[in-house]
Amino acid sequence: MRPQSAACLLLAIVGFVGATEWWESGNYYQIYPRSFRDSDGDGIGDLNGVTEKLQYLKDIGFTGTWLSPIFKSPMVDFGYDISDFYQIHPEYGTMEDFERMIAKAKEVGIKIILDFVPNHSSTENEWFTKSVDSDPVYKDFYIWHDGKINNETGEREPPSNWNSEFRYSAWEWNEVRQQYYLHQFAIQQADLNYRNPAVVNEMKNVIRFWLGKGVSGFRIDAVPYLFEVDLDRYNQYPDEPLTNDSVNCPDPDDHCYTQHIYTQDMPETIDMVYQWRELVDEFHVENGGDKRLLMTEAYTSFENIMTYYGNGVRNGSHIPFNFDFLTSINNASKAGEYVEHIKKWMDAMPEGVYANWVLGNHDNKRVASRFGVQRTDLINILLQTLPGHAVTYNGEELGMTDVWISWEDTVDPNACNSDPDNYYARSRDPARSPYQWDASSKAGFTSADHTWLPVADDYKTNNALQQLRAPRSHLQIFKKLVRVRKEPSFRQGELNIQAIDDDVIIYSRQKTGSDLYVIVLNLGSTSKTLDLTKYYELGTQAEVITTSLSSQYIDGDVIKSTEFVANPYVGTVLVAV
């Protein structure tokens, strides 16, 4: 083995402990319920639709599924604006439907993880209504401020220059209370005040409630926004400094126009994550059963992400999502960039925790659209053969692509706050189109004539049923990957990875005493003939476990290790024979 890989190999051993609990080295599937399966014919996915398809997920081999928000909501931000944290959204079903889903999940052996949205509530939440009325219990449940008077005009203005993620001021005037409230997302999503112990306790009660209903954990949304800087001695909030980026962010209404040093990543945020971990651990001790899981969503600095795991004294998130492949890698990235980001994560992890890899979600363009349809299998091979946890967004296993959605049909508030010329770049709707189950009307998603978002045009040739029936398909490759990922060398084996040129990544996975696997990924547009024995003790021959649809090889082929052909955009998993 080449000396340059030795450090990575050693760190893989340190950072990748032996899997013993259900969640360790898990394979997780994100369901966007509104688009997954509609059971009642209203054009909107629901819980009974999820229940109906749990066996499908189990047959693929997933450990668990996390559901985007299912709680009662006005649906301004499609569930991320919660009006009652203790109720199911009526379009999705009833509490009885939820309990039936939990029972079915236990029957088939798949874990249910809920999306927990702690930063804000809907302005239609009873808490907010009472806060507007200055109810003594709820008066300080949200971030309220009088604003400031403009010395030149004499008019009242927002307290600071903070902008919302969805553009424009993050402060909204309330006529009843005669104050501004903070909303870091939509106007209808009021930020909760985590400096108020009553808020902290209430949100812990929400966690306890759903744990009591039988969920196996939570994916925690938008964690960096939990706390804002405290008021200064003059009872004011400071303006954030400008980014002064006239090229990438010239519009003063955009969120990127300021540096978010007062509205994100406050030190108290990490402590809150640790408190939630203590809560779920205590629940496990008190109630038994399997351990409960915390995943965290935080688009933040790499250094911050590592603190989410824990600080050596207190534990934090089991899975602080690794978004490097979303934020730092694209279809033009070279092989060395992939390897650099993989090594960076593996090198930095605290001892005794697991890596994780997130390649897609409901907030980003789909994998096949970002990296190219021709790389669909290659990217899934990468995801499923790296150490640690794999997180798949619904539809990526089929190679679903983004759907073009007109300005008139756009419903995402992030895009709707833009204009007809710029909305599409901001819109998250294209990645949220209905799941493509079969070639029947509306892709088998619904019996309705209309769906909440348009169905993709290619559903008749690209759907789950067609791919299940085909001898070779994206889904068949994905299923093979999930199966082989359960082998000891993938669950507990060493990682030895390198880029041999700008296009080709090669790495091995092996546990002592178990099979040696070699993975070859050719990101480029030209074939490469490789002598794999120069890099790994593979022997003269190797067997193809699985490979991309466009490969010249098929599963089961025995190839010469010294003359392996890596076709363009093809990934291949090999095992020594």
UniProtKB/Swiss-Prot annotation:
Residues 1-19 form the signal peptide. Glycans are attached at residues 119, 151, 244, 315, 331. Keywords: Glycoprotein, Glycosidase, Hydrolase, Signal. SUPFAM superfamilies: (Trans)glycosidases. The keyword Transport does not apply. GO terms for molecular function: alpha-1,4-glucosidase activity. Belongs to the glycosyl hydrolase 13 family. Pfam families: Alpha-amylase (PF00128). GO terms for biological process: carbohydrate metabolic process. The record marks 363 as: Transition state stabilizer. The lineage of its organism: Eukaryota, Metazoa, Ecdysozoa, Arthropoda, Hexapoda. The keyword rRNA processing does not apply. PANTHER family: ALPHA-AMYLASE FAMILY MEMBER, MALTASE A1. Coiled coil: none annotated. This is Maltase A1. Gene3D superfamilies: Glycosidases (3.20.20.80), Golgi alpha-mannosidase II (2.60.40.1180), Oligo-1,6-glucosidase, Domain 2 (3.90.400.10). Its EC number is 3.2.1.20. CDD domains: AmyAc_maltase.
